[in-house]
A protein has these predicted regions:
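Glycine-rich anion-binding loops of enzyme active sites
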Residues: 1-69
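Short hydrophobic/aromatic beta-strand micro-patches
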Residues: 39, 163-167
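Haloarchaeal acidic low-complexity proteome signature biased toward cell-envelope/secretome components but also
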Residues: 67, 72-81, 87, 97, ...
Length: 210
C-alpha cells in the first residue's frame, strides 16, 4: 500500500511539471527507502559559477518546512507534518530565472550550505540580511526560540527551494515574470568578505553527503 501511494504521488508530481514517470527497480530493505533520479536536457544551463559582486541574491519559497515537519512527526501530528512535506518543484521558476540568473542551485542541503557552495564556485562572498530570509510559519510555531528557529531555517535543509544570483537591473523583471514569489535576501560581495549575515560570518553547516 505504501508503495502504491508513493507511485501515485510521484506520477502526480511528474505530471505537474510535464515530466514522465518511468518506473524503477525494487529490492528489500528494513525500512521504506526511495532513491530517485531525474533525467532531462536544457538548451543552456545555469550552474553555480558566475555570480559577480553587485548581483542580488534571491530565493523561492520559505525555509524550515522540513525541519518543522520533523518536529510535528515527533509530536505525532502526522497530517500537519505530511502537508509540510508536500513541495512544489520549482521547474517553471527555474526556467524563468535562467533568462537572467548568473548562478543558481537548490537549497536541499540547507540555505547556508548552498550559499557557501555558490561562493566557492563563483569565487565570491555574500552579504545576507537575516530579516529578509523567509521562514515558514510552521517553524515559528514549533521552534524553541529565535535562535532555534534561525538554526533550523538555514542549516537543516530539505526545503528544495532555488537560490540564485541576479543582476540588480534584472531583478524587477524576474519578479514580475516568476510564477513563484522571489525574495531578495542579500547581495554578492567580493570573495575576501566571505559569507555573512548582518555582518557576522555564516557557518558552513548543512547536510553533508558521505
Amino acid at each position: 500500500e505504501a508503495l502504491s501511494e508513493f507511485i501515485d504521488g510521484a506520477q502526480a508530481v511528474c505530471a505537474a511539471v510535464d515530466a514522465e514517470y518511468v518506473g524503477g527497480d525494487l529490492d528489500t530493505h528494513s525500512e521504506f527507502t526511495i532513491a530517485t533520479t531525474a533525467i532531462g536536457a536544457v538548451d543552456e544551463s545555469v550552474d553555480r559559477a558566475g555570480a559577480t559582486p553587485g548581483n542580488r541574491v534571491v530565493v523561492t519559497g520559505r525555509f524550515g518546512r522540513s525541519a518543522a515537519a520533523l518536529r510535528y512527526f515527533e509530536q505525532e501530528a502526522f497530517d500537519t507534518a505530511n502537508d509540510l512535506f508536500q513541495f512544489t518543484p520549482r521547474v517553471d521558476t527555474g526556467r524563468t530565472l535562467a533568462g537572467a540568473a548568473t548562478a543558481m542551485m537548490d537549497s536541499s542541503d540547507g540555505l547556508a550550505r548552498s550559499l557557501h557552495q555558490l561562493a566557492e564556485a563563483s569565487d565570491c562572498g555574500f552579504a545576507i540580511n537575516r530579516a529578509a530570509v523567509p521562514v515558514a510559519d510552521a517553524l515559528s510555531e514549533v521552534a524553541d526560540d529565535r535562535e532555534d528557529r534561525w538554526e533550523a531555517a538555514v542549516h537543516f535543509g530539505e526545503d528544495f527551494e532555488l537560490v540564485a544570483t541576479v543582476p540588480a537591473v534584472r531583478l524587477d523583471d524576474m519578479r514580475a515574470a516568476s510564477p513563484t514569489p522571489l525574495t531578495e535576501i542579500g547581495r554578492v560581495v567580493a570573495d575576501d568578505e566571505g559569507v555573512s549575515v548582518d555582518g557576522e560570518p555564516l557557518a558552513d553547516r548543512g547536510y553533508t553527503h558521505s
